[in-house]
Amino acid sequence: MKIRHWSALSLFVLPALAQAEALTGEVHRQPLNIQAIVMFLLFVGGTLYITYWASKRTRSRQDYYTAGGRITGFQNGLAIAGDYMSAASFLGISALVYASGYDGLIYSIGFLIGWPIILFLIAERLRNLGRYTFADVASYRLQQRPIRTLSACGSLVVVALYLIAQMVGAGKLIQLLFGLNYHVAVVLVGILMVLYVLFGGMLATTWVQIIKAVMLLSGATFMAIMVMKSVNFNFNTLFSEAVKVHPKGLSIMSPGGLVSDPISALSLGLALMFGTAGLPHILMRFFTVSDAKEARKSVFYATGFIGYFYILTFIIGFGAILLVGPNQTFKDAAGALLGGNNMAAVHLANAVGGSFFLGFISAVAFATILAVVAGLTLAGASAVSHDLYASVIKKGKANERDELRVSKITVIILGIVAIGLGILFEKQNIAFMVGLAFSIAASCNFPIIIISMYWDKLTTRGAMIGGWLGLSTAVILMILGPTIWVTILGHEKPIYPYEYPALFSMIAAFVGTWFFSITDNSETGKQERLLFKSQFVRSQTGLGASKGGAH
């Protein structure tokens, strides 16, 4: 019972973990939705045209990785929101509210808490110190090759795990929403993702994410307005009517129904909070703006859009309780919701807007997946081409043309691997992969970034040992935990009793980095400490920072 309760929590706290709920159990295939197919084709046609347009404007390495630094703060804020808001969080959080009520609000807002960290501690310094990837920042005053190797490995592991989650989620959700075959859906997403990134680079990826964010926010806003209209825009009426029709009655207005293990809750909370600040595809977006001021604006707008979206999902969830729950049209013979609870928001779209709006929401779900996987692919490709190839293998002497070629080859390889893994993991519950992705981002990427920016005594030795310690501890504890050790490998009891490792792996990373830095008395270590002052000046003033193009 304890594990079951915690599993419910773990599936919904993160946007991508919310997706995992759609991946477990039987998928109820929906009939082919012609409106959804037409709107989806319009979206794909429009975004492929944008990719063609972007390809004409993507001539240099800077254009490919950062759209030439010409994206405005507002545009980048929308794109970050588009990169971060998942279709399944839309379906998953609203499904949680539909099933459990108030708990959904706690988790959807809890998922926002990583953004103030990025706004106040990271965005400005990241933009001033870096150029294309966060490894530029981590290696600013440390030894380039070992630090970039560690950063690239951390990035690629996070990208790979997140990509598997998105691809499997894409296949299952498209099967749910469109009635398409799972394998066809995965291959389709893989091909489109490669086309966007291969030809359009960051410029095409940015505009796909902006369009998706606008579509998702517009659709969710319309649904929320229609729900409120049905109760004369009175929240008291919405909640009191929902309590009357929900099987759990008044308990849907109380918190805490899903939390039974405080250590796991704390561990997942840390992964969520600090992992957000270590996601490579999110951090990469801060280099697309012209300066630190625009980077701060980006986070400000993104936080507003994401927060607004999660408030809408709460209204949508209660709207589904009121308008979908009592309606037998949306139930099967046994009285369960057609397609499972994850379809609550989709059925609500049908209830408030008919088949046309249902088609729109289904197309938005597909658009959302494409936007997220495009951002992940570009982050993975830049880690290989810029960090590993140009800086480690070629020791900073690679020419721009070769680096771009390596990046584009990596995009194709990532696309093939993503399709293969998506098909391979079709039957798996991949919630633990996303939890591991966030845990690794919090245990490896985040400590390196934050300590390199703020602590003057950091040395390469400390960063390397601490970073690898955090990365390996996160992976080992995840394997020894209940999800893999018991559920997948079939052992009777887990060696590590908690679902997520971040609480312990983050401590290992920070303590390891601190201890092995302060005990480093080498000449190299002393030189690295002396370089902190010049780094601090640049991080605060932007003097010497790479400049984006004019807007």
UniProtKB/Swiss-Prot annotation:
The keyword ATP-binding does not apply. The keyword Cell membrane applies. It is a multi-pass membrane protein. The chain crosses the membrane at residues 5-25, 34-54, 77-97, 104-124, 150-170, 184-204, 207-227, 263-283, 304-324, 356-376, 406-426, 430-450, 469-489, 498-518. One of its GO terms (molecular function) is symporter activity. Keywords: Cell inner membrane, Cell membrane, Ion transport, Membrane, Sodium, Sodium transport, Symport, Transmembrane, Transmembrane helix, Transport. GO terms for biological process: plasma membrane acetate transport; sodium ion transport. Its main location: membrane. GO terms for cellular component: plasma membrane. CDD domains: SLC5sbd_u4 (cd11480). Gene3D superfamilies: Sodium/glucose cotransporter (1.20.1730.10). Transports acetate. NCBIfam families: PRK09395.1, PRK12488.1, sss, symport_actP. Belongs to the sodium:solute symporter (SSF) (TC 2.A.21) family. PANTHER family: CATION_ACETATE SYMPORTER ACTP, SODIUM/PROLINE SYMPORTER-RELATED. This is Cation/acetate symporter ActP. It comes from Yersinia pseudotuberculosis serotype O:3 (strain YPIII). The gene is actP.
